[in-house]
UniProtKB/Swiss-Prot annotation:
Swiss-Prot/TrEMBL GO biological process terms: glutaminyl-tRNA aminoacylation; glutamyl-tRNA aminoacylation
Lineage: Bacteria, Pseudomonadati, Pseudomonadota, Gammaproteobacteria, Vibrionales
EC number: 6.1.1.18
Protein name per its UniProtKB record: Glutamine--tRNA ligase
GO molecular function, one term: glutamine-tRNA ligase activity
GN (gene name): glnS
Location in the cell: Cytoplasm
Organism of origin: Vibrio campbellii (strain ATCC BAA-1116)
Membrane-spanning ranges: none
Length: 556
């Protein structure tokens, strides 16, 4: 299979193939243009993979450009976070990071050009009046009384706007297009407004700032973008995109293409709703492992490869649809099953005492880090007289389907010996506190000599040598597939989206690298928390379970 055949295929790539074949373009230049007013989420990751992936596959270029035209809501913190996320996802932008603010002087000149052509005017209607005059989807707008000002007057007023002689909301520059258009975006849109705000890149140089729709298309053209790719909600805006470029003097003529945004079950993507979750402390910040932000997914233990694979699997279309959350979980589960080293951890411990094992003795066992990858090596696991096992791995009585430890019967401890439960000890409430066992010293790495069958295998850790750890069991943040459709989306938060347990982990995990995935055998995939875990206070986050338990619930 050739490299071209191995590429993903979608309608955008088909357009690019045709453009190159027809000679419309000789190379491909895309961009990823976030506004630095928040943290990236997995919906942005889809756009990142699309734009940077196209540039990679066509040996082209992809810019990282910050659409920074709204200084009141933007911050350098978001700039740095976005750069980190793009790099973490596995991509490098071409050249220096771009900012729309780099082009403020040129944008101002293009606004002057539109005024000189009679295609823009200074409007002194209030923002409320502008909305009223714009009309509705069923009623045309009506022209502003300032629409037909002479060009010279508009130039003078626009210069006064720049000089700070108008208060905010008292004047704006509008494109002069068509107040009767069936497309609201074409009814004389505002292209400049007054804002007395310090900008994180330009400081206090400007007190007028261009609007997104005016800025975006010109920035694309100035950077030589060939294919400007955005989501479907900007489809109507393409008319304004084209109008601006058709009416200014500029060499490059990019074209805008739209694809469907990512809608993922059991979460929300709206910046407003995500912000509500954070400000109302319904989650623990933007990087809470339950959040769909790139930083939250990273902290939970998702790998960049798994997110790229997810974006590849869901594809690029114009059809709006809801993607199953299980599809995302499947990608990280496949990745970690293949690449994560194994370790043992007991989340809900009950003690076992092996009565015929020497008291105080420590036997060092050697266990493979991965059952199918010998190249991942081995680790040492201490075995002692007292060990912890999962409480759910023992029953006083059980049927034949129960393949774990039962009173009077045997089970194998993973990587160690066969043990037999002889008797138990309970507290005053009837809870089992200790299981007394014996072990078969001849069963390390082999079956019992007399041929008896021992089918069950359970995990364990040494009670003497294991390390205490806080285990955070993360799950889906909402109880319904589409929380955004609920009257009160916050009321659908899953009360069990975070369950905290105090367990024990094997000592090899003492120096666990933050966010590195492990399979805790039989329990799921986990990683050390990047903010709270330390050598003295181990904290592990569950990334995903070994299997999709929600699928069973949804199918009931």
């Amino acid at each position: 299979m050739s490299e071209a055949d191995a590429r993903p295929s979608n309608f955008i790539r088909q357009i690019i193939d045709k453009d190159l074949a027809d000679g419309k373009h000789t190379s491909v230049h895309t961009r990823f243009p976030p506004e630095p007013n928040g943290y990236l989420h997995i919906g942005h990751a889809k756009s990142i993979c699309l734009n940077f992936g196209i540039a990679q596959d066509y040996q082209g270029q992809c810019n990282l450009r910050f659409d920074d035209t709204n200084p009141e809501k933007e911050d350098i913190e978001y700039v740095e976070s976005i750069k980190k996320d793009v790099n973490w996802l596995g991509f490098e932008w071409d050249g220096e990071v771009c900012y729309s603010s780099n082009y403020f002087d040129k944008l101002y000149e293009y606004a002057i050009e539109l005024i000189n052509k009679g295609l823009a005017y200074v409007d002194e209607l209030s923002p409320e009046q502008i909305r009223e005059y714009r009309g509705t989807l069923t009623a045309p707008g009506k022209p502003s009384p300032y629409r037909d000002r002479p060009i010279e007057e508009n130039l003078a007023l626009f210069e006064k706007m720049r000089a700070g002689e108008f208060e905010e909301g008292k004047a704006c520059l509008r494109a002069k297009i068509d107040m009767g258009s069936s497309f609201m975006v074409m009814r004389d849109p505002v292209i400049y407004r007054v804002r007395f705000a310090t900008h994180h890149q330009t400081g206090d140089k400007w007190c007028i700032y261009p609007m997104y729709d005016f800025t975006h298309c010109i920035s694309d053209a100035l950077e030589g973008i060939t294919h400007s790719i955005c989501t479907l909600e900007f489809m109507d805006n393409r008319r304004l995109y084209d109008w601006v470029l058709d009416n200014i003097t500029i060499d490059c003529r990019p074209h805008q293409y739209e694809f469907s945004r990512l809608n993922l079950e059991y979460t929300v993507m709206s910046k407003r709703k995500l912000n509500q979750l954070v400000t109302e402390k319904l989650v623990d910040g933007w990087d809470d492992p339950r959040m769909p932000t790139v930083s939250g997914l990273r902290r939970r233990g998702f790998t960049s490869a798994s997110i790229r694979e997810f974006c590849k699997r869901i594809g690029v279309t114009k059809q709006e649809n809801m993607i199953e959350f299980g599809s995302l979980e499947s990608c990280i589960r496949d990745d970690l099953n293949e690449n994560a080293p194994r370790a043992m951890a007991v989340l809900d411990p009950v003690k076992i005492v092996i009565e015929n094992f020497e008291e105080g003795a420590v036997e060092t066992l050697t266990v493979a880090n991965h059952p199918n990858k010998p190249e991942m090596g081995e680790r040492e696991v201490p075995f002692t007289r007292e060990v912890w096992i999962e409480r759910e791995d023992f029953r006083e009585e059980a049927n034949k389907k129960y393949k774990r430890l039962v009173l009077g019967k045997e089970v194998r401890l993973r990587g160690a010996y066969v043990i037999k439960a002889e008797r138990i000890e309970k507290d005053a409430e009837g809870n089992i506190t200790t299981i007394f066992c014996t072990y078969d010293a001849e069963t390390l790495g082999k079956n019992p000599a007399d041929g008896r069958k021992v089918k069950g295998v359970i995990h364990w850790v040494s009670a003497d040598k294991a390390l205490p750890a806080e285990i955070r069991l993360y799950d889906r943040l909402f109880t319904v597939p589409n929380p955004a459709a609920a009257d009160d989306f916050a009321a659908t938060i899953n009360p069990e989206s975070l369950v905290i347990l105090n367990g024990f982990v094997e000592p090899s995990l003492a120096a666990s690298e933050a966010e590195k995935g492990y399979q805790f055998e039989r329990m799921g995939y986990f990683c050390a928390d990047s903010k709270d875990s330390s050598a003295d206070n181990l904290v592990f986050n569950r990334t995903v379970g070994l299997r999709d338990t929600w699928a069973k619930i949804e199918n009931q």
